[in-house]
Curated annotation (Swiss-Prot):
Belongs to the enolase family. Signal peptide: none annotated. Its EC number is 4.2.1.11. Pathway: Carbohydrate degradation; glycolysis; pyruvate from D-glyceraldehyde 3-phosphate: step 4/5. One of its GO terms (cellular component) is phosphopyruvate hydratase complex. It comes from Paraburkholderia phymatum (strain DSM 17167 / CIP 108236 / LMG 21445 / STM815) (Burkholderia phymatum). The active site is at E205, K337. Catalyzes the reversible conversion of 2-phosphoglycerate (2-PG) into phosphoenolpyruvate (PEP). It is essential for the degradation of carbohydrates via glycolysis. This is Enolase. Coiled coil: none annotated. Its cofactor is Mg(2+). It is found in: Cytoplasm; Secreted; Cell surface. The lineage of its organism: Bacteria, Pseudomonadati, Pseudomonadota, Betaproteobacteria, Burkholderiales.
Amino acid sequence: MSAIVDIIGREILDSRGNPTVECDVLLESGTMGRAAVPSGASTGSREAIELRDGEAGRYGGKGVLKAVEHINTEISEAIMGLDASEQAFLDKTLLELDGTDNKSRLGANAMLAVSMAVAKAAAEEAGLPLYRYFGGSGAMQLPVPMMNIVNGGAHANNSLDIQEFMIVPVSQPTFREALRCGAEVFHALKKILSDRGMSTAVGDEGGFAPNFGSNDECLSTILQAIEKAGYRAGEDVLLALDCAASEFYHDGKYQLAGEGLQLSSAEFADYLATLADKFPIVSIEDGMHEGDWEGWKLLTDKLGKKIQLVGDDLFVTNTRILKEGIEKGIANSILIKINQIGTLTETFAAIEMAKRAGYTAVISHRSGETEDSTIADIAVGLNAGQIKTGSLSRSDRISKYNQLLRIEEDLGDIASYPGKSAFYNLR
C-alpha cells in the first residue's frame, strides 16, 4: 500500500507574478509527488471556483493562503493514510469533503494541487513515468501542438479582439520535427514584425502582441512567416483561432472594437466562415459566447463538418455540460483545462466522454502557468491527440514542450505523431 503520510501546501507564484497553490504529498516509502496549479485570465462563468483570499493589501487580493490552509488542515486530515494509488477514491473523498457543486468551499486550486500531487507520488512509487501511470501500455501517441504565436484579447494589450492566433504543424513525422517547425515559424514571424517596426514584445502565453489593423492582416502575416520559414501553409502548417468570444459579447452583439464591428450571432458565424474560407484554419475555439447556445448551434451547423469547433468557456471541462452539448449537437470538440474542474478523475471522465461521442479533446494550459508539466503527461497518457500550451518562448510554456520531447524519446520506436488525423472529428 502506498500510504500517504504527509501533505504540505504552499503559496508560490505563477508566470504572471500572481500567487498559486503548490502541494507536496509524501508516501510511507519516502516517495514524494509535487504539483502546482495554473490560473486563467479569460474564464468561463461555470468553472470550478479558484479560492482567493480577497485581502486587498496582500497581492491585490489574489493571495491563496486560505486554499493552502485547507490543504494543510482539513484535506490533510481526510486523506492521511489513504492509498495514493487509489486516485478515484481519493478524488471522491475530496469532492465529498468540499460538499459543493463548484468546489467553492475548499477551492478547486487546493483540490487540484492535491489530486495531481497524489498521482505524481503514486507514479513515482510504481516506478512509472507519469504518462505511463495515467495511460498504461496504450499511451504512445504524442499530441499535435496548437502554438499561440500571436496574442490578443485578454492575453495582450493590443487592438486584436481574437485572443489567440495559432499555428498547427501537421505534416511532420515526429513531435520533435513539429516542434522545430513551430519554433522556426515563430522566429520567422519575429523577423517580419521587426522589419516592419512592429512590437516583438510577448503576451501572457509567449506569443507576439503587435497592433495589427485587423484579424485578416494578422492571419496574412502568419502565412508569410510560414512561407519564410520554408513551410507550406495549408499543407505543412494549419491555423487555429481562440476567439474567446465571451470576452467581447455585450448587449447581445459580438463587438469587435479593433475592427469597429457589432455583429449578431448569425453575422459573427458568417464572419468566422469567411475567415475559414480565406485561410487554412482547422480549429476555432470559443467562437460564440458561452451562453449563446443558439449561436453555437448556428456555427456548428455552418462549419462543424470542416472546422474543429472547440468549447472552452462553453463546456468548462464539465461532463454534465458536455453531455448537454453533445445531445444538442453543439461544437465538436472540448478544451480540457484541469483547473476548470478541479480533480484528475473528473478531467479524465470529460476526455473519455468526448471521445465516445466522436468529439476531440484538446489538453490545455492556462495563461497563468508554472513550471509544472503534468498536462504534457496527460496529453500522452490519455492519447488526447492535441495540446495547447502556448508559444515558443517563456519557460512556463516551453516546460511542457520539453516534457513531450522527453516522453517521445522514452517511447522510442512506438511513439506516433498523428498530424492531420488528430482531427478525427472532421473525417
